[in-house]
């Protein structure tokens, strides 16, 4: 009878002869790690393993904050440790210098390895805390993100804001131009003023072609000549109204009407013989009625004031004069 336990080697013996899996790798994995590509499946598996499987010793000088060359150096040391059979003794001899999970180049602060690891988390490196903060706006109530929307023209000269061209330029453009409706007062020279005054004495209301011709002759704009005539007529009308009111007239005589759209007030205050006859109709009737009716039959009839007046000036008593002449003719024929 044979006892299998006696012939079979103990269970722990093959494990002593067999190399540790963490120390030696198959030929395929060794060729994979020998390459520099970091996108292979083996590299991703090695990176995703817990730190206890890939714990390796590093010198004390490497405990300083990791730099840009640290991941490459750690990767090279890791491959050399995995390939060397004596790395286990070094790992066992220096447990204090073992790399903590927080200092791994691929360590995630909120990853599964960080949550399940029993090692205390390291605080943020003082060198990282001493990094200069991002530059913000000079004023305490504005952050750096609002700086492009603020121009230096809205703040005093002591502000350190650099003006950005093309940012909200419409308020500045509108501020420099005069508002619509505010026209600058034109300054006329003596020659221009004399020419305008001479033309105004000839005609108070200048026509559009004459106005354009006068503007081109004097080197002015058509609107300037138009406004000058408007202001001059208003000044002239006010002076004539004062003269008319002082002489006992009414203001309506100076205003334009449908029959006389352009009243001429140059003769205000100066009454001619026709005006005296209109003011005294009794004298006009006495002037037309002769003392002897026979003289009317022998001689021609005198002209009526309506016919003697100028044709350009309308007379308010033209209808009444014609009626009175008809009555006088009837009386003359009857007598």
Swiss-Prot record:
Ranges of Acidic residues composition bias in the record: 318-335
Locations listed in the record: Nucleus
Top-level taxon of origin: Eukaryota
SMART domains according to UniProt: HOX
One cellular-component annotation, GO: nucleus
Location of the region described as Disordered in the Swiss-Prot/TrEMBL record: 58-102, 240-335
Gene Ontology molecular function terms on file: DNA binding; DNA-binding transcription factor activity, RNA polymerase II-specific
Sorted UniProt keywords: Developmental protein, DNA-binding, Homeobox, Nucleus
One biological process term in Gene Ontology: regulation of transcription by RNA polymerase II
InterPro entries the record matches: H2.0_Homeobox_NeuralPatt, HD, HD_metazoa, Homeobox_CS, Homeodomain-like_sf, HTH_motif
Any matching Pfam family: Homeodomain
Annotated Low complexity bias: 83-95, 299-317
Family per similarity comment: Belongs to the H2.0 homeobox family.
UniProt name for this protein: Homeobox protein DBX1
Annotated organism of origin: Mus musculus
